[in-house]
Each structure stands twice: as structure tokens, then as C-alpha cells.
Amino acid sequence: MGANISGGSPEFDRNDDVYSRKLRLVDLPENCVALIMTRLDPPEICRLARLNRMFRRASSADFIWESKLPANYRVIAHKVFDEITLTKLIKKDLYAKLSQPNLFDDGTKELWIDKNTGRLCLSISSKALRITGIDDRRYWSHIPTDESRFQSAAYVQQIWWFEVGGEFEIQFPSGTYSLFFRIQLGKTSKRLGRRICNSEHIHGWDIKPVRFQLATSDNQQAVSLCYLNNNPGSWSHYHVGDFKVTNPDVSTGIKFSMTQIDCTHTKGGLCIDSVLILPKECAKEVIGSQ
């Protein structure tokens, strides 16, 4: 006769004068429960861990959480943690830490692991980008804002030659990734607790499109042309393109840019917050939460 697994109280059923006990999940050995947990998603594991002490102990097994981490998690973790910290952390705690945004490179970049896909997410501050003319305060300035992960955005008041670029290299977990620029027309601030947008410098973005571009070290390329016509004071994510990673053991280098270098007219009134690199499957969800 087959055994039924149940989380409730023990039950006995009469069947042809033979009593058969229904097996409860709590009756299983701790190592069996841990094996079952490897088949569950992290939120489900955490819910089970709250049921009793045995489940809580089982949920801390290293092999459970190592199966939820990317295969190359050590490379990713070394970006944000030193060797001593990594040695002390059990895999459950390491997963918890990597699932939250972690700043690195002097606070100009942030990475985390997406809980649904186990893939890498990256955010790169405007301060880590190459911006032509950024040191000339007649054109550019870094403005404080609590609407940025990095508490700062680059603002161009007016310029003829608009050119912003950057690059990054790491061993990405396998999968397809999307790259976005997070930008806003106008400059927002707060007055008497209310959010207001200064749009007086917005001009030139409707004359010629901005060219967004990315290229990878394995010769993948993407180009898109977009007029910047989103509503002033509203952050928008402009999709540059996608790239695929098939070998997580090899570093993938990415170069990206947004340019508008037609010098027949000026353009201005634009905030650049960051560049986002996200697993394609969860990009909409992550962007929607910002």
C-alpha cells in the first residue's frame, strides 16, 4: 500500500481489517526533509522553516542553499565580500545577503541575485559612467536625490555633444540579460514635502533620436534609436538591447552607451540615474518596483 504524506495529525484508516498509518511530513527524518526542500523555492523553504524546530534545522543545510545559488556564486560574492566574511557565512546566510542589493566599487555599483531565476542583477551609478564634459559645471552637475539607489544623479542643463558610456565585466550566470538606461526629463526636488519637477531646461530631445548601443566581448551587439519623449518628472527605463551568456565560467565584458552628437542643436534638461543589467525574465518586475 502507498504511503500518504500529510502535515496534519496521525490518522488510521480501516481497509480490509488492516490499519495503515498515514505518514506526516513531520515524521520524516531531518535529512529527508532537507532533500525535499531542495525542490522548493526559497520563499516556500522559509515558510516551512517557521513550522517547528526540526524544519528550521533542516532548512539551514548548506546543500539546500548552494543549489539555489548560481554555479559561479563565489566569483559574484567576491565582488562584495572579503574572504574572511565568506568563510564565516553558512550558505543560507550567504544567499540571504546576495538576495539583497550590495554596494561595491566605492558605492558606485550594486549587485544582487534574483530570487526567481538565480541570475545576477546589476545597477551602475551615473558616477561610474564616462560622461563627456561632466567636469564642466556650465553643462553638467551631480544632483542629490532620494529617488536613486545611489542618492545621486547626473543632470545636463544644456550641451551640444551628448555622450554617456560605460563598461563592466564579470562571469554572469547563464541566461539572457537586458540592459537599460534609467533616465528622467526634468529635475525633481521637494518643496514643503511635495515633489515638484523643474522642466525649464528640457529641449532638443524631440529633434533627433538618441542612439543607444551595447556590445559584448563575444561580439554580440544591439542598437536602438529613441526620441526622449517621456513625461517630465517621470523616471523611464530605455531598453538598449539583450545579450546571452552560455558559459558562466568565462567573463563577459559589456560596453554600452547613449549618444546624441548632432551638433546642429543643443539639448538639455535630462537626468541620468543609472544603468541596469537584469535577467530578461524578471526585468519588468524589477523595473516596476523602482
Curated annotation (Swiss-Prot):
It comes from the Eukaryota. It is found in: Nucleus. One of its GO terms (cellular component) is nucleus. Pathway: Protein modification; protein ubiquitination. Keywords: Nucleus, Ubl conjugation pathway. The keyword Nucleus applies. Residues 21-67 form the F-box domain. GO terms for biological process: protein ubiquitination. Pfam families: F-box, PP2. InterPro entries: F-box-like_dom_sf (IPR036047), F-box_dom (IPR001810), PP2-like (IPR025886). PROSITE patterns: FBOX. Part of a SCF (ASK-cullin-F-box) protein ligase complex. Interacts with SKP1A/ASK1, SKP1B/ASK2, ASK5, ASK11 and ASK13. PANTHER family: F-BOX PROTEIN PP2-A13 (PTHR31960:SF3), F-BOX PROTEIN PP2-A15 (PTHR31960). Component of SCF(ASK-cullin-F-box) E3 ubiquitin ligase complexes, which may mediate the ubiquitination and subsequent proteasomal degradation of target proteins. The F-box is necessary for the interaction with ASK proteins. This is F-box protein PP2-A13. It comes from Arabidopsis thaliana (Mouse-ear cress). The lineage of its organism: Eukaryota, Viridiplantae, Streptophyta, Embryophyta, Tracheophyta.
